[in-house]
Regions:
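Transmembrane catalytic cores of multi-pass membrane glycosyltransferases
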Residues: 123-126, 131-140
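Interfacial juxtamembrane loops and adjacent helix segments
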Residues: 54-128
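Transmembrane-helix motifs of polytopic, lipid-linked glycan transferases
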Residues: 157-175
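Short hydrophobic alpha-helical membrane-embedded segments
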Residues: 129-133, 153-161
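Juxtamembrane segments of multi-pass membrane glycosylation machinery
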Residues: 138-155
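Short extracytoplasmic/periplasmic juxtamembrane "stem" segments immediately C-terminal to an N-terminal membrane anchor
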Residues: 39-56
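Membrane-water interface at transmembrane helix exits
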Residues: 21, 25, 29, 139, ...
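Hydrophobic secretory-pathway targeting helix
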Residues: 1-38
Length: 175
């Protein structure tokens, strides 16, 4: 019985922490997020050196041609960015729970994001509140200070750091 109570307390604490975290990032002003998302749509032609994103890369470009494991999912990334930059008219706590974004009615999230950033009034408001959008807890603050290309580079650096730390751990244990 003690074990069940402990698990329920941990679950409740996690739930409250998740709600608090998502509500806090919805307090961030969307101006800088929209500016950096807009920068991510520009600077075409530099993808090989510094991936700026989206419009010129398309929805699923390959880093290594023909190798499916190197495919980038710009389609989903764009949906996530659109979710992050949307300025809801609802209070922050309600906006955090509704998870709204603008959609142009077509199945083209890159165009939908571009249209929203060019004309903040265009498109219909779509809500996707089925699950907790925890990625926004990280994405919104990062997008407030850098564009998507830099976020990709930061992600790569974090991935490489984790790989090096794992390798060091394996070497220490002689595995």
């Amino acid at each position: 019985m003690k074990q069940i109570k402990r698990v329920l307390k941990i679950l409740a604490a996690g739930l409250l922490l998740g709600i608090l975290a998502i509500c806090l990032v919805y307090l961030l002003p969307c101006g800088s997020l929209q500016k950096h998302a807009s920068e991510s749509l520009k600077n075409a032609g530099q993808e090989k050196l510094h991936p700026k994103i989206l419009k010129t890369e398309g929805e699923n470009p390959f880093l290594l041609e023909g190798y499916k494991g190197s495919s980038l999912d710009n389609y989903t990334d764009t949906l996530m960015i659109t979710q992050a930059v949307y300025q809801s008219e609802e209070p922050f706590y309600k906006a955090a729970m509704l998870s709204e974004r603008k959609n142009n009615g077509k199945d083209q999230p890159i165009e939908s994001l571009r249209e929203y950033l060019e004309n903040l009034q265009s498109g219909e408001v779509v809500s996707y509140s089925r699950y907790w959008h925890g990625y926004l807890v990280v994405l919104k603050p990062l997008l407030a200070v850098m564009d998507y290309g830099k976020i990709r580079m930061l992600n790569l650096a974090a991935f490489l750091l984790i790989q090096v730390l794992l390798l060091i751990g394996f070497l220490k244990r002689k595995l």
